[in-house]
């Protein structure tokens, strides 16, 4: 069965703060209790202010193969270099969440990390020409996508594949099967305080072969 979900239709006109339940089942989960992360609906999605933390709907859980995509607009320059983007493979979301996230930052770099509770392991990071840097006003618009297929996970920015990881890899020296880890909840991740708009959040399972990045 093909599942396609576009967030725009799910968001009523409400504001959501840290630890509160998001609209239509969406939730905000901050990294620490002292953190503020606010959500405000926009015409095509929502605006996140604050962080670090994640925004997700527990019902948006998918199994490989699938893809998740959203357009991110950094509205102004953050106080320091900050990664923001998508997360996928979310499990144990109410206790010690485990997921992989894919973010971009102001210097044109991307970051892929695995998080399990308080443990964070870096999988890859690099600069890439496809990532649009902020203008003089601190604004930048980039579309991020993660494509999860049987043999690889592809990471795309503005339609270009910036990285790909095989279904078998290692995190912190421990071998694991990625396909066992990447099924789960999909959502949005912010690494540090920032003001960012997220439009057209979308996931699809499965997706067509000719749409895949790898």
Where are these regions (language model features)?
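Low-complexity, Ser/Thr/Pro/Gly-rich disordered linker/stalk regions
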Residues: 20-78, 213
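N-terminal secretory signal peptides that target proteins for export/translocation
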Residues: 1-2
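Extracellular beta-strand elements of beta-rich domains used
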Residues: 199-203
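Secretory/extracellular carbohydrate-interaction modules
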Residues: 50-118
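Bacterial N-terminal signal peptides
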Residues: 5-15
């Amino acid at each position: 069965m093909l599942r396609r979900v576009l967030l725009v239709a799910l968001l009523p006109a409400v504001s959501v703060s840290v630890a509160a339940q998001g609209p239509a089942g969406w939730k905000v989960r901050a990294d620490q209790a002292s953190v503020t992360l606010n959500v405000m609906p926009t015409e095509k999605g929502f605006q996140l202010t604050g962080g670090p933390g994640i925004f997700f709907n527990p019902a948006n859980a998918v199994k490989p193969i699938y893809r998740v995509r959203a357009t991110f607009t950094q509205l102004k320059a953050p106080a320091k270099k900050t990664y923001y983007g998508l997360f996928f493979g979310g499990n144990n979301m109410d206790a010690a969440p485990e997921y992989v996230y894919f973010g971009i930052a102001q210097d044109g770099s991307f970051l892929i990390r695995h998080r399990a509770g308080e443990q964070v392991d870096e999988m890859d990071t690099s600069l890439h020409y496809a990532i649009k840097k902020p203008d003089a006003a601190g604004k930048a618009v980039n579309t991020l996508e993660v494509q999860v297929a049987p043999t690889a996970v592809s990471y795309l920015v503005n339609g270009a594949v910036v990285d790909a990881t095989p279904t078998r890899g290692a995190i912190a020296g421990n071998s694991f099967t990625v396909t066992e880890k990447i099924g789960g909840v999909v959502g949005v991740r912010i690494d540090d305080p920032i003001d960012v708009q997220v439009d057209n959040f979308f996931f699809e399972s499965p997706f067509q072969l000719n749409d895949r990045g790898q």
